[in-house]
């Protein structure tokens, strides 16, 4: 028996009805087949830059910026031997013949997609096993296939893993994962939030609603992991994921379509309020000299409607500008308008608005250290909203027309080349809808 009575209609990213009357629990990260596969594969998938390894060896530039060792150049044909290297690496990575190990060459042998077997994850405390096992296997494989001498083997290690372990990260390495290293987590349970917005945008090939969906899936799955989506708060996150992330009842699509031509943040807020009134989610509680104060008997559902409106406002505003930089202001003033105009709580009960204040300062005020694309839900500025702010940033970066210094192309090229080849990463909305439990 379902725990909750809520049911939603599911639509694709073109506004077409796909499935009717789906219980929200079918979209839970604990139940939905596609979401569970996305999370599992994100933990075990590694991108290997074989072209980068070859270039690093030939130039003797390893270990990050400024690290050049003249006299240690190696003329190694990594790309020409890519098939043999990949085959030998797979033999080392797999636990047994026929398991779910994947080593697939892409882009004419310049890149490799690796999925370490599930059995390695099951025998590990956390996800570092994926990049470390992959790196070790490719280092040994390149040494063997390309007949590297014992005196030059350390250069191969440096070309693959970079400065690690002298550095905490794989500085200057030629492997990449969606998940950042555990040492950079803000606290327990933050791993799935520790993914650059640009990585999400790159993996979904800048499809706005797919980027929103993947971001929302990761954020809310993290809430289940860290204990936020438990008990009284589980329904809040299920509804938030459904409406903001997965276009439930076509609400997000309808709001964008209605406001796309000449709408504003304010007009989106008005439409959200009207839709919520029509659907019986909110109602006028009292009038004060003509000012209507609204209330609701279902805060979780109102929050979901408001969260969908927040992404819609971002798409309308940042889409009009074709620039992501103003996303923090959109998050701030969408909520500000809701609170002052209607007396209703903003998204995430003030946490999204509060996040936007700090986000504005850190992304382009006197601090101004980085653009929206290099933030994530693990960042000290943006971590405070419980899954409802980062999907807006993903939407903004998907719509950006190249205005950012830190663009997905700059920060996430290897992620795009490899992770976008995985169907569930590229089109999560499609697979979550198709693979929801009946």
From Swiss-Prot:
SUPFAM superfamilies: Methyl-coenzyme M reductase alpha and beta chain C-terminal domain, Methyl-coenzyme M reductase subunits
Major location (coarse): cytoplasm
Subcellular location as annotated: Cytoplasm
Residues involved in coenzyme B binding: 369
Segments passing through the bilayer: none
Residues annotated for coenzyme M binding in this entry: 367
Family annotation (Pfam families): MCR_beta (PF02241), MCR_beta_N (PF02783)
GO molecular function annotations of the record: coenzyme-B sulfoethylthiotransferase activity
Annotated GO biological process: methanogenesis
Cofactor note: Binds 2 coenzyme F430 non-covalently per MCR complex. Coenzyme F430 is a yellow nickel porphinoid. Methyl-coenzyme-M reductase is activated when the enzyme-bound coenzyme F430 is reduced to the Ni(I) oxidation state.
Cellular component terms per the entry's GO annotation: cytoplasm
Cofactor(s) in the UniProt record: coenzyme F430
Source domain of life: Archaea
Pathway: One-carbon metabolism; methyl-coenzyme M reduction; methane from methyl-coenzyme M: step 1/1
Enzyme class: transferase
Keywords: Cytoplasm, Methanogenesis, Transferase
Family classification: Belongs to the methyl-coenzyme M reductase beta subunit family.
Cited function: Component of the methyl-coenzyme M reductase (MCR) I that catalyzes the reductive cleavage of methyl-coenzyme M (CoM-S-CH3 or 2-(methylthio)ethanesulfonate) using coenzyme B (CoB or 7-mercaptoheptanoylthreonine phosphate) as reductant which results in the production of methane and the mixed heterodisulfide of CoB and CoM (CoM-S-S-CoB). This is the final step in methanogenesis.
Subunit and partners: MCR is a hexamer of two alpha, two beta, and two gamma chains, forming a dimer of heterotrimers.
Protein's name according to its UniProt entry: Methyl-coenzyme M reductase subunit beta
